[in-house]
């Protein structure tokens, strides 16, 4: 049985207030279904106009896997920050670790990536998440990421 939903949708305006990232390095468009078990789904609509496609690769554009991992980390950051109770919400997220990273299939312009993230551990201000990046329900990348939430 799935954990109850705490927050239905975090839109881009709230993401901009939550994360310090900006164009061209803000790599999620919204986060949906943040649940009480500290899980949620980040959404990234991949456009041919992404700056990464200028060099990756001009004749056959493929969305870089490392940017998918960053998208996972940004999704995890939003889930962590939005899940902290009270008025003293963290104001910064620092990416700490990447483990068990695998790239399964290429992501192309026009694809929508869903970053399915779930907390697998927490100690004080440090959080760890497992993530699957999916396109049309197919896993295209996976990783465990760690982050520190701080002022």
From Swiss-Prot:
Catalytic residue positions: 56
* UniProt GO MF annotations: (3R)-hydroxyacyl-[acyl-carrier-protein] dehydratase activity
- Localization per Swiss-Prot or TrEMBL: Cytoplasm
Q: Which CDD domains match?
A: FabZ
Q: What class of enzyme is it?
A: lyase
Location (main, coarse):
cytoplasm
GO cellular component: a single term? membrane
Q: Name one Pfam family in it.
A: FabA
Query: Superkingdom, according to UniProt?
Result: Bacteria
Keyword set includes Transcription: no
**Statement: the UniProt record of this protein carries the keyword rRNA-binding:** no
- Which keywords appear in this protein's UniProt record, sorted alphabetically? Cytoplasm, Lipid A biosynthesis, Lipid biosynthesis, Lipid metabolism, Lyase
**GO BP term, pick one:** lipid A biosynthetic process
Reaction it catalyzes: a (3R)-hydroxyacyl-[ACP] = a (2E)-enoyl-[ACP] + H2O
The EC number on file is 4.2.1.59
Q: Which family does it belong to?
A: Belongs to the thioester dehydratase family. FabZ subfamily.
Protein function: Involved in unsaturated fatty acids biosynthesis. Catalyzes the dehydration of short chain beta-hydroxyacyl-ACPs and long chain saturated and unsaturated beta-hydroxyacyl-ACPs.
This protein's name: 3-hydroxyacyl-[acyl-carrier-protein] dehydratase FabZ
Q: Which gene encodes it?
A: fabZ
């Amino acid at each position: 049985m799935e954990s109850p939903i705490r927050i239905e949708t975090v839109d881009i305006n709230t993401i901009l207030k939550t994360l310090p990232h900006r164009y061209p390095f803000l790599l999620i468009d919204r986060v949906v279904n943040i649940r009480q078990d500290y899980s949620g789904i980040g959404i990234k609509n991949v456009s041919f106009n992404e700056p990464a496609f200028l060099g990756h690769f001009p004749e056959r554009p493929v969305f870089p896997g490392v940017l998918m991992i960053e998208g996972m980390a940004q999704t995890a950051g939003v889930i962590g920050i939005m899940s902290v109770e009270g008025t003293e919400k963290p104001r910064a997220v620092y990416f700490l670790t990447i483990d068990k990273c695998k790239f399964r299939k290429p992501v192309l312009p026009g694809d929508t990536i869903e970053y399915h993230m779930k907390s697998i551990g927490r100690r004080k201000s440090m959080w760890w998440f497992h993530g699957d990046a999916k396109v049309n329900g197919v896993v295209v990348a996976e990783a465990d990421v760690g982050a520190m939430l701080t002022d």
